[in-house]
Amino acid sequence: MDRTIADLRKDYTLEALSEVEVDTNPFRQFKRWFEQALAAQLPEPNAMTIATSTPDGQPSARMVLLKDFDERGFVFFTNYNSRKGQELAENPQAALVFWWAELERQVRISGRVEKVSESESDYYFYSRPANSRLGAWVSNQSEIIASREVLEQRMQEFQHKYENQEIPRPSHWGGLRVIPSQIEFWQGRSSRLHDRLLYTLLNDDSWEIHRLSP
């Protein structure tokens, strides 16, 4: 190996991010950037890291997929009994990060978390392929299992159980919405002097924008 990890670096030169050019509303600004990520045909532009923690501050993070967003917040779906589901039930605060390397951009979001409505969870669940719906029954997410064969056996059992009938949504599976209090837009710049614009929600539900030092 000719290069060490310390040698790995890239100079960011594609774009700039100006207070004059961004939307005053962070959701509209996110929509603008997300549409540009789609237009650039990035692989899974809706992939995001979500960080949660226990009440005593033990953190954990993983990748999930954004499935909806509007001015109410950012929605993903999961097993409520999973580690993240349990942590969010006990400590309903989370942080999200989108990283769009090809555009030299990231978006950081933090805020409180709440479950979406039953109808929203149903709507998305029934839009999924049948095997994905079965997977919500098969996997006791985050629990230790003896082998891969355990999952495959359970899949066969549920395929037989729901053969030729509608697969219902498990009560332990559904959507969660991150309701942001802060959203930061980061644009890579040359010499590591990146552009960082932070939107913070005020008491009157308006947003103020500040530039952060990189």
From Swiss-Prot:
Name of the gene: pdxH
Top-rank taxon: Bacteria
Pathway: Cofactor metabolism; pyridoxal 5'-phosphate salvage; pyridoxal 5'-phosphate from pyridoxamine 5'-phosphate: step 1/1; Cofactor metabolism; pyridoxal 5'-phosphate salvage; pyridoxal 5'-phosphate from pyridoxine 5'-phosphate: step 1/1
Binding site for FMN: 62-67, 77-78, 83-84, 106, 141-142, 186, 196
Reaction equation(s) it catalyzes: pyridoxamine 5'-phosphate + O2 + H2O = pyridoxal 5'-phosphate + H2O2 + NH4(+); pyridoxine 5'-phosphate + O2 = pyridoxal 5'-phosphate + H2O2
Binding site for substrate: 9-12, 67, 124, 128, 132, 192-194
Keywords: Flavoprotein, FMN, Oxidoreductase, Pyridoxine biosynthesis
GO molecular function terms listed in the Swiss-Prot or TrEMBL record: FMN binding; pyridoxamine phosphate oxidase activity
EC number(s) reported in the record: 1.4.3.5
Cofactor(s) this protein cannot do without: FMN
Name of the protein: Pyridoxine/pyridoxamine 5'-phosphate oxidase
Enzyme class per UniProt: oxidoreductase
Record organism: Trichormus variabilis (strain ATCC 29413 / PCC 7937) (Anabaena variabilis)
Keyword Flavoprotein carried by entry: yes
HAMAP family to which the protein is assigned, alphabetical: PdxH (MF_01629)
Stated role: Catalyzes the oxidation of either pyridoxine 5'-phosphate (PNP) or pyridoxamine 5'-phosphate (PMP) into pyridoxal 5'-phosphate (PLP).
InterPro entries named among the record's database cross-references: Pyridox_Oxase, Pyridox_Oxase_CS, Pyridox_Oxase_N, Pyridoxamine_oxidase_dimer_C, Split_barrel_FMN-bd
